[in-house]
């Protein structure tokens, strides 16, 4: 039958905790643990082959997606992730035109996966993933026509006692919030705008209430128009003024730059 391999981030691991969980499992013959460097494609492929894996579930920072995605292809494994391959802004018109979009790397290789007869389901977490399923359900069962699919995330990013405390990967937070957000319209296709644009107050249900949300780059806008018949697709996040202020300061200081810098001869 083979086995499933879940890739965890090399920068976020504790092998003792992994062993602790493993020791509590009733059927130790069904599970195993191993150290793996998620940036090392060869290492991933060797471990997948050694364990006769048939599924690779990628649960790490999307900066590692390409090599894990390619490792799954090379080893014939079904592949799933919760965030798609990264984007690159347009070199001269970043706030109006798309450069390399989220997931482009994966979609460009779709035909090769089909020909090989293996399955890849990128973006199958909550956002993206569950939100896309909800949208498809709405199209199939609730509405005759859809003007806009608007994903609204009312996340509370404040933690008492901390001035700035993202609740997931700090780098992913900086990148997705400061990258040009993507919007899709039926007559225009995909285009970009400035970060934190088009603020609106959305009244969330369940006692959450009104929260200001702004445009943020997210996979749903790249996925939904491919399968949902709508006139517009957007994603907005409830970041809050303080959180946005910190992000703008990081950008002003150049601390959002992915390029290597040299300090006293060290990169």
Predicted regions and their residues:
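C-terminal catalytic/substrate-binding lobe primarily of soluble NAD(P)-dependent oxidoreductases
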Residues: 140-267
């Amino acid at each position: 039958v083979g086995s499933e391999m879940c890739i965890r981030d090399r920068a976020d691991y504790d092998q003792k905790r992994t062993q602790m969980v493993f020791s509590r499992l009733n059927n130790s013959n069904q599970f195993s643990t191993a150290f793996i460097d998620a940036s090392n494609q060869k290492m991933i492929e060797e471990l997948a082959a050694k364990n006769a894996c048939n599924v690779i579930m990628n649960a790490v920072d999307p900066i590692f997606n390409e090599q894990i995605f390619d490792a799954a292809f090379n080893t014939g494994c079904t592949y799933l992730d919760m965030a798609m391959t990264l984007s690159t802004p347009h070199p001269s018109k970043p706030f109006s035109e798309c450069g390399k979009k989220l997931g482009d790397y994966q979609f460009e290789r779709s035909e090769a996966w089909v020909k090989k007869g293996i399955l890849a389901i990128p973006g199958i977490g909550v956002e993206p993933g569950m939100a896309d399923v909800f949208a498809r359900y709405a199209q199939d069962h609730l509405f005759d026509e859809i003007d806009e699919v608007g994903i609204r995330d009312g996340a509370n990013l404040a933690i008492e006692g901390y001035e700035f405390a993202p609740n997931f990967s700090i780098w992913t937070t900086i990148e997705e919030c400061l990258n040009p957000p993507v919007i899709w319209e039926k007559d225009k296709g995909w285009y970009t705008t400035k970060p934190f644009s088009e603020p609106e107050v959305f009244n969330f249900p369940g006692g959450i209430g009104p929260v200001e949300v702004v445009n943020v780059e997210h996979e749903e806008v790249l996925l939904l128009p491919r399968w949902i018949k709508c006139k517009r697709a957007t994603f907005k996040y409830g970041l809050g003024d303080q959180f946005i202020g910190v992000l703008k300061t990081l950008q002003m200081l150049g601390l959002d730059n992915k390029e290597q810098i040299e300090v006293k001869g060290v990169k």
